[in-house]
Amino acid sequence: MIECYILAGGQSRRFGEDKTLFPLKRKPCIQWVVEQAQRVCDRVFVVAKEPQKYSFLKGVELLKDILQEQFALAGLYTALSHTDQDRMVILSADMPLIKGELISLIWERSKNKITLFKVKGKIFPLFGVYPKGVKSTLEEYLKGGGLRVMEFVEKVGYEVVEDVGPFSYAFINMNTKEDARVILKIEIL
């Protein structure tokens, strides 16, 4: 069984408003991510500080962040605490161009380590597969004041998938309004 946890707890500071709800061709950004996850995953969860604002999404389960702080590792911690599977897919809610094929690819390539995409030299820590076994290390990292996802995955160790075929366009995070304009120009949506 493939469980997917979409992390939607960011602050959207650079975007100026909640980017997960920003409309892209008549759909909120997060809905594009959810629909691709639903193509290939058995269960899809949205993890957020205020999950009720995603109640319009069909076929997903909403989870409230366990930790009060608003940062990506809080969502990851919630997902690791919730799952009863050995591993899970983690996606960021601000990547509307992701494709189900990429989710399937990283799932098939993952074993018992964190597995992430590396595209054009950049690691994407919020598009990958995480084993449940990293939860205790994450707890220690958080207790020590750690906040950065990349710092955490470097501490634990990870594997990468680099061959994304024709899907390199999918690795755009929507952090600014300019990013949204770029995404809207790509004829994939």
Feature map (PLM): residue ranges:
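Nucleotide and nucleotide-moiety/phosphate-recognizing core
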Residues: M1-K135, E139-V149, E154-F171, K177, ...
